[in-house]
């Protein structure tokens, strides 16, 4: 009876999450990256290949994971968000899978409930970004590897390797690798596998990884992928950010901060708690935390990658601290009820107005003064994505990171403008204006409309 009640509660919660996620795909655009990726995907869909023509800052795993759903569901921002939302739902199922493998299904429900009370996580489940994908692929890799550790069937190891490769090639993520190695070490230490088994598994890992690279990554072009996504990250490392920027972000998410502090406190309170399976989750969570202290440039949306392992660790630690099962389940049910009500409230109270009045006005003007095949340029890429008037492929991403790191130089920008002769140039959020000598480029343009402040639309003279 208890099992049936648990399954019923979990299924109801997952269904509520699914339907509220579906409703929220029209939530207002707050992240400029959504416009960048929408514009990039539309250019790719028009036959301008990613990396070789269309600048694409994310590694190929992001495109491979989202683009099929983007096309299948309608080639819109909402279709991309829906695809991200479906991947996040798969991640929740992976959490439940892990909790069943570790014979503590209630920790899965607690983890899901807490995740949907943490803005750093749930905001990213419906944002056209790659951070939720990293967590989902790492969770699937962990679940498969735990399954392998129990039954030693090669299929589960291969599945785990595939997902860890997908996580790596989605954002060059290495945060789960130490946990992957630790699980194999524990199997060897417990004499469940031998040295020869380890060697064979390493060979399988290398073979699968090489095959993944040859089949999925190489076709995009090694040089092109390196220049667009890998080189940009090295250039962006020089970005100046405060040393403790991570803690500035955490101060704005009280629950996540409490969970991190609680996890660290409970882990250190009694060290013998840090044994299997806690040690594998602890390794993952701590490794992400350490990396994020030093990682640059670090943005608030990156916290989603930290949230998942920390919540998993906290949920497992709570099991060990509360020997009274009734109290433990009461706490879980309380978190579940709060999260359930929160999801309903957020879905009802969140506006379905995708863009602001100013952005809509700009899009209307863009459509009035340009044709569908005209080239336009804006640093507010949601305007290009939603209007269907796209920039030159090399300017699909006019991000502050590209400009500050000189990945997009003033000379290169000027050459692209001279060659493509865009009909409209729309400086909106200060990024275009931060390009050196940007005003000189506007000598061939006249002011068409002033939306407000620095939000202007310029049209090419003679058009």
Positions of PLM-derived features:
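Hydrophobic/aromatic-rich transmembrane helices and adjacent perimembrane loops
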Residues: 176-177, 289-329
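Membrane-interface transmembrane helices that cradle and orient dolichyl/undecaprenyl
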Residues: 101, 105-106, 141-159, 191-192, ...
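Extracytoplasmic
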Residues: 174, 219, 338-463
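Membrane-interface alpha helices of multi-pass inner-membrane proteins
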Residues: 111-112, 156-172, 178-183, 207, ...
């Amino acid at each position: 009876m208890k099992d049936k009640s648990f399954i019923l509660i979990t299924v109801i919660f997952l269904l509520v999450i699914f339907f509220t996620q579906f409703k929220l795909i029209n939530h207002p655009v707050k992240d400029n990256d959504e416009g960048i990726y929408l514009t990039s995907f539309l250019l790719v869909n028009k036959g301008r290949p990613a990396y070789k023509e269309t600048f694409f800052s994310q590694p190929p795993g992001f495109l491979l994971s989202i683009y099929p759903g983007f096309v299948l569901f309608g080639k819109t921002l909402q279709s991309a968000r829906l695809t991200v939302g479906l991947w996040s739902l798969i991640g929740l199922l992976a959490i439940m899978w892990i909790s069943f493998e570790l014979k503590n299904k209630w920790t899965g429900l607690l983890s899901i409930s807490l995740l949907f009370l943490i803005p750093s996580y749930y905001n990213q489940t419906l944002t056209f970004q790659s951070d939720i994908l990293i967590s989902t692929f790492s969770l699937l890799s962990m679940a498969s590897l735990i399954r392998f550790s129990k039954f030693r069937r090669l299929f589960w190891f291969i599945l785990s390797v595939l997902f860890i490769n997908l996580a790596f090639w989605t954002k060059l993520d290495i945060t789960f690798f130490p946990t992957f190695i630790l699980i194999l070490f524990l199997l060897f230490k417990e004499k469940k596998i031998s040295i020869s088994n380890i060697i064979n598994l390493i060979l399988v890992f290398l073979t699968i990884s090489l095959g993944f690279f040859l089949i999925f990554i190489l076709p995009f072009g090694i040089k092109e992928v390196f220049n667009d996504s890998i080189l940009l990250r090295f250039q962006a490392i020089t970005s100046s950010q405060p040393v403790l920027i991570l803690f500035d972000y955490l101060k704005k998410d009280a629950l996540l901060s409490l969970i991190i502090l609680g996890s660290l406190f409970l882990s250190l309170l009694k060290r013998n708690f840090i044994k299997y399976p806690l040690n594998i989750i602890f390794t993952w969570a701590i490794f992400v935390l350490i990396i994020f202290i030093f990682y640059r440039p670090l943005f608030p949306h990156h916290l989603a990658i930290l949230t998942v392992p920390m919540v998993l660790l906290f949920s497992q630690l709570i099991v060990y601290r509360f020997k009274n099962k009734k109290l433990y389940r009461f706490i879980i049910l309380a978190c579940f009820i709060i999260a359930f009500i929160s999801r309903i409230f957020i879905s009802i109270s969140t506006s379905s107005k995708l863009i602001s009045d100013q952005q809509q006005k700009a899009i209307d003007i863009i459509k009035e003064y340009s044709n569908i095949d005209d080239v336009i340029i804006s640093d507010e890429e949601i305007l290009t994505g939603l209007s269907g008037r796209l920039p030159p492929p090399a300017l699909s991403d006019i991000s502050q990171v590209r400009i500050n790191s000189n990945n997009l130089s003033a000379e290169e920008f000027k050459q692209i403008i001279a060659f493509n002769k865009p009909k409209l140039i729309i400086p909106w959020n200060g990024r275009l204006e931060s390009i050196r000598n940007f005003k000189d480029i506007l000598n061939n343009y006249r002011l068409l409309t002033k939306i407000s402040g620095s939000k202007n639309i310029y049209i090419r003279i003679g058009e």
